[in-house]
Design a protein with these regions (language model features):
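Amphipathic alpha-helical transducer elements in NTP-driven molecular machines
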Residues: 29-32, 123, 127-130, 166, ...
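Nucleotide-state-sensitive switch-loop elements of NTP-binding domains
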Residues: 1-17, 22-25, 30, 34-206
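C-terminal lobe/tail of nucleotide-utilizing enzymes
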Residues: 1-11, 213-335
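Short, flexible segments with low predicted structural confidence
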Residues: 104-105, 191, 212-213, 219-220
Length: 335
């Protein structure tokens, strides 16, 4: 199967592609090239960086921020800023406080304290990323959304978020049944819920649970959501990726391919290069063994940084346009 043929699309529904792996393996370059290729195929594509240490702007050589920026006719990009996301919630809270009664104000003051804690708590990055996922999931504004993810640990926390939130909402619903209006302030701790005193807390919690269930269904639908694991031919990257795929399986998220990046050519007149090549050949055999049920694609080690759309399109040629080995080596040398 050609690597490009593994993509699946449902008419009128957004496809989600997560690109992940160990830090430093080239996730952003692969994500950017994938998004460019999809956009060039006529798909309205959004690429989202969920990594707190963003490098998407550097990869595309375009200034990108917290709000979507148009890169070309079909490509849009955003770098999630959790601080800005929290600031937006604080502004919305202040607006509500200006119209609140004394009783409501007490609850909103409590919410403000919780938001302050949440902004500094572990998981704030993942909460902001999950909110973006919910937003694009429900809007179907884009044909495809590519997530350029943070290193493995962050990404697993992001993808476990629906399970965590489902448990949290369930407990809040029980608390609501037991305590009644005492949970009116607590309901707003959930990052993607609006505090609206005119709507019953139980109804809002039930709606939130429904939204989370929909998110879980989308994430576990292999026709809509897939994970592409980027590795390099080194043991630490391979074993971490193997563990990550096992964790993704627990959340019913399909890993449909392995992209092996930074594969060296055999340069026989360079002892160091030849030694590295021989070591990589052993690691490539290990990859074939570990991931025998996956589609595996190889990307060569370029002599220059792969950044900017021109060089990313060279990566597109190799990854998605089926260049043979001679053409690959020629492109590597000429970059």
């Amino acid at each position: 199967m050609a690597f490009k043929d593994i993509f699946k699309f449902k008419q009128g529904q957004t496809t989600f592609i997560f690109v992940g792996g160990k830090g430093g393996v080239g996730k952003t370059s692969i994500s950017s090239a994938t998004a460019l290729w999809l956009a060039n195929q006529g798909k309205k594509t959004l690429i989202v960086s969920t990594d707190p240490a963003h490098s998407l702007s550097d990869s595309l050589e375009v200034t990108i921020g917290h709000y979507p920026v148009q890169i070309n006719e079909n490509l849009f990009a955003v770098e999630i800023d959790p601080d800005k996301a929290m600031e937006e919630k604080q502004r919305a809270l202040e607006s509500k406080k200006s119209m609140a009664s004394a009783d409501q104000l007490m609850g909103l003051d409590f919410l403000g304290e919780q938001l302050d804690l949440a902004s500094a708590s572990p998981g704030a990055d993942e909460a902001a990323a999950f909110e973006v996922f919910l937003s694009v999931m429900t809007s179907n504004e884009y044909d495809v959304v590519v997530f350029d993810t943070a290193p493995t640990g962050h990404t697993l926390r992001l993808l476990s978020f629906p399970e965590v939130m489902d448990s949290w909402v369930g407990k809040l619903m029980k608390a609501k049944a037991a305590l009644g209006n005492a949970t009116n302030a607590l309901k707003n701790i959930i990052p993607f819920m609006d505090a609206d005193e005119d709507i019953q807390t139980r109804q809002e919690l039930e709606e939130t649970k429904k939204q989370i269930d929909e998110a879980k269904a989308v994430l576990s639908d292999p026709d809509r959501t897939t994970f592409k694991m980027v590795v390099i031919p080194e043991e630490m990257s391979i074993y971490e990726s193997e563990r990550a795929i096992e964790a993704l399986n627990k959340y019913n998220i399909t890993t449909d391919s392995i992209i092996v990046n930074q594969v060296m050519p055999d340069i026989s007149d360079c002892d160091f290069c030849h030694s590295r090549y021989m070591l990589q050949q052993k690691r490539l055999a290990l990859i074939d063994q570990k991931f025998s049920n996956q589609v595996v694609a190889e990307v060569p080690l370029f002599k220059d940084e792969v950044k900017g759309q021109e060089k990313l399109l060279k990566l597109v040629e190799i990854l998605y346009e089926g260049k043979d080995n001679d053409e690959v080596q020629q492109n590597v040398i000429q970059l």
